[in-house]
């Protein structure tokens, strides 16, 4: 049964009409080169049985594939835990992971420039290298590999995602994980957004569980928390936490804050300039004022992700706009030490009207995409391996592990064993080393399909997961990535870099007058860099995407 129909089962029902509406879909707007499926080295090997998924035929024919993961933080090894060993046993495929040691873009660009891309490549769907690799003929067309070596692809892939990622030449080169459609959001009550406003539970309750939705309430709460709890276990309290500052800005202080303030993505059929919205401007000034008074610690401007995760695990932050899914491991550490020291989700900053926040889940684009390089000597094994990972069998394996070892079937449903749940809830690193389920290998995860096996949440994370289902919206029609090398891509890159330099300067501005001057300079420079042209192109893309997604 195909991946799409598994989604329908999990969500009660999904609309099939979107499949037809997405034919010739836009996705990442790129043309692409022909796949040119080669004669492979499989000539002397076992050939797949047309009646079976190819991975079953290849199980006794070992091969190693190199897989580049474009995230320096990814460190789960292959071959040492139950899930990866089971996958290798079932498919014959051993994996050698390659990850960047430093800057992700520099590493991937070097691989592209030297024509040394490994067999498989996984990166964010929005990254410019996706279109670069496609347009330069560096990756195979997945549909051509499927037709030549493994038609099982058409059974396990989601036709909506396939249509969305199909390029103008009729080929699909990249397949997403975590792909969610507007209909999924409408029909699946358990879908959530991981964008949350978090507070440390014991501190928040000690200061009276205040309303932090207004600037006045927010400032008062931050100041009272810092006054009552200047230190946490001998270390200074960090009143306000955030994601890391990077070459795009800081999602906590831009995109997430805008979403909590319910700032729209469009107005009157035109892509909206969220950065100049009065509500966003007002709240940025709130944070600037707090910074002037000493409540924005230097740590948040310089810390790496690893450093921040360490401080979350120590409970050093009072509050933060943060993706709760990025701190579940640290949350469980806090819970094990003191259940009252965990973070809880509460109502965060709101606009002057008190409107509900707009909390997006992932979209039809997904999170990452995976491609097969033309350097791959065994593309027939690569496509069969991806098809395996898309299947319901592998989704259950990568999510819950192996029946009889990590879970049992009770009343027709898989249930994690108590000892497995205990280690998962208390020591994620040890769990990954020994078992490697719970989407440790997330590259082809299907969140909607996995809803049918959803387990009772850990008491450490239950409140976060429950709150995450509030105010969920779909915003994939606004996800725009211009073709690598295009005029618009160059203009937007320069504007984004300018914003990444401006945002910390705004927050650290010594006065409101300096803030205003910096912001005016940003707007002026942004216009000079081609902002009007970029927004016109985004509006055109948005309207096209809405039509193809069936969104009014």
Give names to the regions the model predicted:
Residues 2-12:
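Bacterial N-terminal signal peptides that target proteins for export
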Residues 11, 26-217, 249-255, 263-266, ...:
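Conserved N-terminal structural module of periplasmic/extracytoplasmic solute-binding proteins
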Residues 19, 42, 224-228, 311, ...:
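A short structural micro-motif
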Residues 21-25:
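C-terminal motif of bacterial Sec signal peptides marking the signal peptidase cleavage site
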Residues 61-65, 91-95, 115-119, 138-140, ...:
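Loop/turn elements at helix/coil->beta-strand transitions in domains of secreted/extracellular proteins
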Residues 72, 131-132, 243-266, 288-443:
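Extracytoplasmic/periplasmic substrate-binding proteins
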Residues 143, 171, 176-248, 266-311, ...:
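Helix-loop-helix "hinge/cap" segment bordering the ligand-binding cleft or interdomain interface
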Residues 388, 392-510:
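Conserved small-residue motifs centered on glycine
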């Amino acid at each position: 049964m195909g991946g799409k129909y598994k989604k329908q089962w999990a969500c009660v029902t999904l609309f099939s009409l979107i499949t037809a509406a997405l034919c010739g879909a836009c996705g990442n707007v790129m043309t692409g080169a022909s796949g040119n499926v080669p004669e492979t080295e499989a000539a002397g090997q076992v050939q797949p049985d047309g009646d079976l998924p190819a991975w079953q035929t290849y199980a006794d024919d070992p091969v190693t594939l190199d897989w580049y993961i474009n995230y320096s933080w990814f460190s789960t090894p292959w071959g040492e835990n139950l899930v990866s060993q089971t996958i290798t046993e079932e498919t014959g495929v051993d994996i050698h992971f390659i990850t960047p040691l430093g800057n992700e873009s520099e590493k991937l660009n070097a691989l592209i420039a030297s024509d040394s891309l490994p067999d498989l490549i996984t990166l964010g769907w929005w990254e410019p290298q996706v279109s670069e690799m496609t347009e330069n003929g560096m990756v195979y067309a997945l549909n051509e590999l499927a037709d030549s070596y493994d038609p099982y692809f058409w059974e396990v892939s989601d036709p909506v995602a396939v249509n969305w990622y199909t390029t103008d030449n009729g080929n699909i080169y990249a397949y997403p994980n975590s792909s969610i459609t507007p209909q999924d959001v409408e029909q699946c009550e358990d879908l959530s957004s991981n964008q949350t406003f978090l507070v440390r539970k014991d501190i928040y309750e000690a200061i009276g569980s205040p309303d932090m939705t207004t600037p006045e309430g927010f400032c008062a709460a931050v100041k009272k928390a810092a006054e009552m709890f200047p230190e946490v276990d001998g270390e200074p309290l960090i009143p306000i936490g955030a994601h890391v500052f990077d070459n795009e800005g800081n999602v906590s202080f831009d995109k997430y804050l805008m979403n909590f303030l319910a700032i729209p993505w469009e107005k009157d059929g035109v892509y909206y300039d969220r950065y100049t919205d009065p509500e966003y401007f007002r709240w940025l000034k709130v944070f600037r004022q707090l910074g002037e008074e000493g409540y924005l610690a230097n740590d948040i401007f310089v810390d790496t992700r690893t450093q921040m995760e360490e401080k979350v695990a120590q409970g050093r932050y009072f509050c933060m706009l943060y993706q709760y899914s990025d701190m579940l491991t640290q949350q469980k550490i806090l819970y094990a030490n003191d259940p009252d020291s965990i973070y809880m989700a509460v109502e965060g900053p709101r606009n002057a009207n008190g409107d509900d926040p707009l909390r997006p889940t992932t979209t039809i684009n997904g999170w990452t995409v995976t491609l097969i390089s033309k350097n791959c000597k065994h593309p027939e094994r690569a496509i069969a391996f991806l098809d395996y990972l898309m299947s319901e069998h592998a989704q259950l394996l990568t999510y819950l592990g192996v029946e009889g070892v990590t879970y049992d079937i009770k009343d027709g449903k898989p249930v994690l064993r108590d000892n497995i749940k205990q280690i998962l809830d208390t020591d994620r690193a040890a769990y990954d080393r020994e078992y490697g389920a719970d989407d440790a290998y997330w590259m082809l995860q299907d969140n909607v399909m996995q809803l049918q096996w959803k387990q009772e949440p850990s008491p450490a994370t239950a409140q976060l997961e429950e709150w995450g289902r509030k105010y969920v919206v779909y915003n994939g029609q606004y996800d725009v990535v211009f073709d690598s090398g295009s005029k618009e891509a160059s203009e937007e890159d320069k504007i984004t870099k300018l914003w990444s330099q401006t945002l910390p300067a705004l927050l650290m501005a010594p006065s409101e007058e300096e803030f205003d001057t910096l912001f005016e300079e940003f707007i002026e420079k942004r216009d000079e860099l081609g902002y009007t042209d970029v927004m016109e192109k985004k509006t055109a893309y948005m309207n096209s995407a809405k039509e193809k997604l069936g969104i009014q």
